[in-house]
Design a protein with these regions (language model features):
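An N-terminal assembly and electron-transfer interface module characteristic of large anaerobic redox
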Residues: 1-424
Length: 424
């Protein structure tokens, strides 16, 4: 693992490849996950996923291989794990994940499973040896699912690739995206990663188009499906803001002949009037929605997409800086400065050192850093981990409903700053 990936996985908002692949596997109902590795890796991945996917922990197991297994192999540990699940679990399918160290041993997972004559299919995956991030693990796992698919008769539907329940409000985002597409008469065949069944995911080759919303999670799988099933794909990112959502739908409609945007556009215009009404009421009392500085620190789609919506539709600022948690070729004129975590760390540290107030949209890692530095700020969480706020409602960050929610959150952040200043 490169030093930058290690830092991102263990000290910032990213996690490891084992967690990424487990996040996809655990999202499929009836699927169990065995972590072939130490308890540390197991507990870390299980807890991280279960926090956003209640009940996932009940379908996790760990082989706990000892030091001898690193030399002689983990066959005994795996067989013990299989026997445990025979007695205590009821999997429809089992995914076995080798952690970094066990990946170096080279055990034939599926061969060991075949000798055990198990009543359910077993799929094995290495989590990258000593190299890999959450996105890399998720991408590798999605490609593994594509390998299990068979050609099917084509329909007019689409697949949405690159969503995960493990992302902040990820399941709610998926529900909103499905709602928007169906509002435009676009049938969704499958959305892996957010609770779709195995049967639904295996129907993905029926689709006439793959919509990739996060390149780092799903571009490789889309390329695989283009090669195997001749399904074209478009990379469109995530829809943020009202106008941003309409542009997003227009891009998809250009590729789907049966799409009709009339109902979606009508809803957007209606909701825009509502936002304008509430926004004008607030401006008359508190002034314009302005921040001297705005800082984003999140994955690429969240950072760039929300930044474009924020500056184009909701608020303004003297300077908007983005710290991307992964590199990307995507760009937006809404951003003044772009830095990449693990590449521009010296400049990122300088940004925090010079910070003297404004809005930060990030995870709790960044807000805690500013607190430790005794820097003034107001905040809005747009990515995990989040330690000082609970997310229970089904409100998304993206789409029409997400635009309303984010506008509300950003206004409330501004108001909380006014209240704190009044108290001091």
């Amino acid at each position: 693992m490169q030093p930058s990936e290690w830092e991102n996985s263990c000290h910032r908002i990213g996690t490891c490849a084992l967690t990424g692949s487990a996040a996809l596997f655990a999202s499929i109902p009836g699927s169990y996950v065995i972590v072939n590795g130490p308890l540390w890796c197991y507990f870390y991945a299980m807890k991280y996923i279960d926090d956003s996917m209640p009940g996932a922990a009940e379908r996790f197991y760990c082989t706990q291989p000892d030091q001898n297994s690193l030399v002689y192999g983990t066959e005994k540990d795996l067989i013990n794990g299989f026997e445990y699940l025979k007695k205590n679990g009821n999997p429809e399918r089992l995914f076995v994940q080798n952690n970094c160290s066990i990946s170096l041993v080279g055990d034939d997972i599926e061969g060991i499973a075949a000798k055990s004559h198990l009543p359910w299919p077993v799929y094995g995956i290495d989590c990258g040896g000593l190299h890999g991030s959450f996105a890399g693990g998720f991408s590798r796992a999605l490609s593994l699912l594509v390998q299990q698919m068979n050609p099917l008769k084509k329909s007019d539907g689409v697949n949405v690739l690159g969503l995960s329940s493990v992302y902040l409000r990820g399941k709610a985002d998926a529900i909103e995206i499905r709602r928007l597409l169906e509002l435009c008469d676009i049938h969704v065949v499958s959305m892996p990663g957010v609770g779709d069944s195995w049967e639904s995911i295996m129907k993905a080759p029926e689709a006439a188009l793959n919509i990739v919303v996060r390149n780092e999670l799903a571009l490789k799988a889309a390329e695989d499906m283009k090669s195997r099933f001749d399904i074209p794909y478009i990379s469109v990112g995530l829809p943020y803001g009202m106008e941003g959502t309409l542009r997003w739908l227009n891009r998809i409609a250009e590729a789907v002949n049966s799409a009709s945007l009339k109902a979606a556009e009508m809803e957007i215009r209606c909701r825009q009037k509502r936002l304008l009404h509430f926004g004008n009421n607030m401006k008359s009392m508190w002034g314009t929605l302005w921040f001297d500085r705005i800082l984003f620190s999140a994955p690429p789609e969240e950072s760039l997409g929300i930044a474009e919506a924020l500056r184009g539709e909701w608020a303004d600022t003297e300077n908007l800086t983005v710290h991307l948690q992964a590199d990307t070729c995507s760009k937006t004129p809404a951003v003044d400065t772009v830095r990449v975590v693990g590449i521009n760390d010296i400049s990122i540290a300088e940004d925090y050192k010079k910070w003297d107030g404004g809005l930060i949209l990030s995870s709790s890692h960044e807000t805690e850093r500013l607190l430790r530095m005794n820097k003034p700020f107001v905040s809005c969480h747009i990515t995990r981990p989040v330690y000082d706020e609970i997310a229970v409602s089904d409100l998304p960050l993206c789409g029409i409903r997400g635009a309303e929610y984010l506008y509300e959150k950003i206004w409330n952040a501004k108001l909380s700053g006014h209240i704190r200043m009044a108290k001091t």
